[in-house]
Amino acid sequence: MLYWLAEWLGFPGALNLIRYLSFRSGAAVATAMILGLWIGPRFILMLRMRQGKGQPIRDDGPQSHLAKKGTPTMGGLMILISLMISALLWMDLSNRFVWACLFVTAGFAVVGFLDDYDKVTKSSHRGIPGRVRLLVEFLIAGVAVLLIVSRTGTDLYLPFFSGIVIPLGPFYYVFAMVLIVGFGNAVNLTDGLDGLATFPVIIASLTFLVIVYLSGNVKFAGYLGIPHVPGAGELAVFAAAIIGACLAFLWFNAPPAAVFMGDTGSLALGGALATIAVTAQHELVLVLVGGLFVVEALSVIIQVFWYKRTGKRVFRMAPIHHHFEQLGWPESTVVIRFWIVSIVLALAGLATLKLR
């Protein structure tokens, strides 16, 4: 909105700064973080009053988690409010990539909210039926992919190699939809310990802030040998807003958490990151940068598949962060070590920009 206003006025004086992605990205971080810190205490109090028992805690999980009973969920709404306000203020709203990201973020947030609401009101872990949830997520992802691909094409670029492209054609639509839905649910599965998902989301967002900025600049993209996507740089502002909103949320989600993100936040953030990656045509780099989330999701898939096939478990408990808890690792140890892994994977993802 501010970009439109400044453009309408002709970018006079200090408003000329709004032309620059770097300025608007910094402003988006600050705006989202300040908003999040301001609404946080009020929002948490409201959630406590409305939810009563808070998020249901699994009885078959680590015994230390029983102390978390009564902690409110749906804290992702705090993230969404500060993220959306900041993004709408500082982004160029004439950019279709912006609307694709906003659509996935809001759509997945609604799905997550309904799931959280069902769990809280029924004091159950089930939520809305999985098939219904996946169907809606795929429909949302499909709309976003149509918006994006009309400007980017259907080629898949391989990281670490310059000029090697796999033309997927119509199959790209399915691939991109699976990536968006899968990554959204992978972040959701990771959000099981205080701060575990939030910090890696910040790291992944920072990484893709750099990637989309470079992809959107024809000179940088040409120098690095990465696909140039005109207009993709605008999503650097969106990634910055995610960072600011998540930093504010982490203030309240740090152990012992005063609020949980819930499916409302985790689904939305995962979907948003994947949509940014699809726009920048760095889909496989997302799998590397978000490797922590991928491993968490794979641990659940492997556990369920193997148990149904043999009646035995591969892990003591899935997702895999609970496996390490069952091995005797304190929650804080699991969280910090997983944070370290996310940083290393992000650095590896950035290395793909140069190592070609």
Curated annotation (Swiss-Prot):
One of its GO terms (cellular component) is plasma membrane. The chain crosses the membrane at residues 27-47, 73-93, 97-117, 134-154, 163-183, 195-215, 232-252, 258-278, 285-305, 333-353. Pathway: Cell wall biogenesis; peptidoglycan biosynthesis. GO terms for molecular function: metal ion binding; phospho-N-acetylmuramoyl-pentapeptide-transferase activity; UDP-N-acetylmuramoyl-L-alanyl-D-glutamyl-meso-2,6-diaminopimelyl-D-alanyl-D-alanine:undecaprenyl-phosphate transferase activity. It catalyses: UDP-N-acetyl-alpha-D-muramoyl-L-alanyl-gamma-D-glutamyl-meso-2,6-diaminopimeloyl-D-alanyl-D-alanine + di-trans,octa-cis-undecaprenyl phosphate = di-trans,octa-cis-undecaprenyl diphospho-N-acetyl-alpha-D-muramoyl-L-alanyl-D-glutamyl-meso-2,6-diaminopimeloyl-D-alanyl-D-alanine + UMP. It is a multi-pass membrane protein. It is found in: Cell inner membrane. Its EC number is 2.7.8.13. InterPro entries: Glycosyl_transferase_4, PNAcMuramoyl-5peptid_Trfase, PNAcMuramoyl-5peptid_Trfase_CS. Catalyzes the initial step of the lipid cycle reactions in the biosynthesis of the cell wall peptidoglycan: transfers peptidoglycan precursor phospho-MurNAc-pentapeptide from UDP-MurNAc-pentapeptide onto the lipid carrier undecaprenyl phosphate, yielding undecaprenyl-pyrophosphoryl-MurNAc-pentapeptide, known as lipid I. This is Phospho-N-acetylmuramoyl-pentapeptide-transferase. It comes from Sphingopyxis alaskensis (strain DSM 13593 / LMG 18877 / RB2256). The lineage of its organism: Bacteria, Pseudomonadati, Pseudomonadota, Alphaproteobacteria, Sphingomonadales.
